[in-house]
Design a protein with these regions (language model features):
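Conserved beta-strand hairpin/beta-sheet module of binuclear metal-dependent hydrolase folds
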Residues: 1-45, 124-137, 141
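Residue-level marker for buried hydrophobic side chains located in beta-strands
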Residues: 26, 54, 78, 132-134, ...
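C-terminal regulatory/interaction regions
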Residues: 207-247
Length: 247
């Protein structure tokens, strides 16, 4: 009997998932700093070793516990989308990837699906045993299900962090053809029987005004922040928004 996956949520928003396999546990995404405590507690409760970390993408809220986990589990593997490695060093992650992933690759019971857009090498994982799709940030379920290219004031960071809004929307549409029973997103609770909600979210992103409004709005804000940063009027770097390092 297959053990169900475990959702580990920081602040109720930032998700990582422990997926039991025959040889131990696969961790999908690594949250922000402190996620290792949740991971290790769950691993002890399950009585299973952590074998690998498989990232959906390399943004700061998905890689925070990698280096700490690597010191705690010396044989741990780090799996990253082949086109999504450049951010790791910029984010201060010292651990190099063990394996680069492309669509169609297998990670235990998981099949890798290329979903570029939110980041250049974003990937999703489908567990064919139970039909769970780990979509990363192509879809966001805060405060309701939406494509990450669609801005919502309640939780705007995934949209600010989106590398290519139009490509993200196309990736979301492609996921409608995946035979899934549960959608597990990077932010917010999992959704059973998700296809109706996914279709509505994709249609909203393709509605003819919403994606354009989002793209123009985010681009305008980023441009304004960049100008203010250049003028010394704000503290910090607008680069995090421009390069899609958050969300």
């Amino acid at each position: 009997m297959t053990r169900p996956p475990i959702r580990l949520a920081q602040f109720g928003l930032i998700n990582a998932y422990l997926v039991p396999e025959a040889d131990g546990l696969t961790l999908i995404d690594a949250g922000v700093r402190g996620m290792d405590r949740r991971v290790n507690r769950a691993a002890r409760q399950l009585g299973l070793p952590l074998r690998r970390v498989a990232l959906t993408h390399t943004h700061s809220d998905h890689v925070g516990a990698i280096d700490t986990l690597m010191t705690q589990w010396p044989d741990l593997e780090l799996l990253v989308g082949a086109d999504d490695t450049t951010n790791l060093a910029d984010l201060g992650v010292r651990t190099p990837p063990t394996r680069l992933l492309r669509g169609g690759d297998r990670v235990g019971s998981l099949t890798v699906i290329d979903t570029p857009g939110h980041s250049p090498g974003h990937v999703a994982y489908l567990d064919e045993r139970d039909g769970t799709l780990y979509s990363g940030d192509t879809f966001v379920n805060v405060p309701r299900l939406r494509v990450a290219s669609v801005l919502h004031a309640a939780f705007p960071l995934p949209t600010f962090g989106t590398h290519d809004p139009a490509q993200t929307t196309r990736a979301a549409r492609a996921l409608l053809d995946v035979p899934l029973r549960t959608l597990a997103t990077g932010h917010g609770p999992a959704i059973p029987d998700p296809l109706p909600a996914m279709r509505r979210a994709v249609q909203a992103a393709e509605s003819g005004c919403e994606p354009g409004v989002v793209t123009r709005t985010v681009s305008g804000w980023v441009g304004h922040l960049t100008r203010l940063g250049t003028d010394g009027a704000v503290a910090g770097k607008a680069l995090a928004y421009r390069s899609g390092r958050t969300g």
